């Protein structure tokens, strides 16, 4: 499973920042956000927050995954599938 990740600024534990998706033009955009807590503890206090975005009319969909290992360092990436931070 390929994970493209980018390190973001350090955040406090249990703080999730919301993402806003806006549409330019007349294309219809449907936004659905799912908060998924992975029950698989990959080591210590690791957890992940997953949001799913789909766009009708534009023909694409992607999953954004938020994972934190100890609650202080965070990474945001685009993954195919769900709960792929353990791989």
Swiss-Prot record:
It holds the Pfam family Coiled. This is HssA/B-like protein 28. The gene is hssl28. It comes from the Eukaryota. Belongs to the hssA/B family. One of its GO terms (biological process) is sorocarp development. It comes from Dictyostelium discoideum (Social amoeba). InterPro entries: HssA/B-like_chaperone, HssA/B-related. The lineage of its organism: Eukaryota, Amoebozoa, Evosea, Eumycetozoa, Dictyostelia.
């Amino acid at each position: 499973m390929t994970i493209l990740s980018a390190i973001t600024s350090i955040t406090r534990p249990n703080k999730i920042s919301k993402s806003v998706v806006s549409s330019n033009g007349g294309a219809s955009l449907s936004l659905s956000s799912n908060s998924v807590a992975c029950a698989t503890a990959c080591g210590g206090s690791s957890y992940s927050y997953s949001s799913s975005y789909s766009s009708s009319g534009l023909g694409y969909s992607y999953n954004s995954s938020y994972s934190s290992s100890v609650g202080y360092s965070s990474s945001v990436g685009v993954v195919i599938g769900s709960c792929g931070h353990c791989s």
